[in-house]
Amino acid sequence: MSHLIAPSLLASDFANLQKECEMINSSDADWYHLDVMDGVFVPNISFGIPVIKYINKHTLKPLDVHLMIVEPERYIVDFKNVGANILTVHIEASKHLHRTLQAIKQEGMKAGVALNPHTAVEQLEPVLEETDLVCMMSVNPGFGGQAFIEGTYRKVEKLKSMIVKAGLDTKIEIDGGVTSKYARKLIDCGADVLVAGSFVFKSENPIQTISELKKI
């Protein structure tokens, strides 16, 4: 299977969200990546349920919703109701992670677990069978436009080995600082999904940039 590209709307022009959605619809992108931040788990506040409900009216591709919030289990049904197809929670923010992943799946969504850069992939082992997607942060979460942490490669290789050994088809997603400079090596290490924000939306031709990432 070819790798997937998920442009992150955190880096988009919020004053022209409908146009940004139409651009992604017409591109080679596979998913929309939506970062929800609460100003508590991460030091920033982005957008939430009402904005995603609006975005969903203009999208033709799956919504990959990444919750950077405390107590994510409180909002599972709310995000399902506004169109989330994949719902990812942070291992660092979930007290009862196994229960939360089961609840996400019961609502018909794919269940994802995100890891901050300092979190060891071995912590995923108890819930790996319940996890459809692992979102590996390659920057410290909270702000777009940060530099890629190159230690991510080793973590991807280790996680891929765990997935293969367990006989699972869990996808590995890389989120943070992704550009064409890092994409090929990430894919070779085992990444399945590349989230790209500033690299796409700040480029002169976002559609072409997405296409180039897809062809790598």
Which ranges hold each PLM region?
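Conserved N-terminal beta1-alpha1 strand-loop-helix module at the mouth
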Residues: 1-88, 93-96, 103-106, 111, ...
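Conserved beta-strand segments that form the floor/walls of ligand-binding pockets within enzyme
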Residues: 4, 114, 135-138, 173, ...
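Short beta-strand segments at enzyme active-site cores
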Residues: 32-35, 172-174, 196
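Short acidic loop-to-helix transition motifs that present clustered carboxylates
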Residues: 118-120, 179
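Active-site/ligand-binding-proximal alpha/beta "capping" segment
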Residues: 140, 147-193
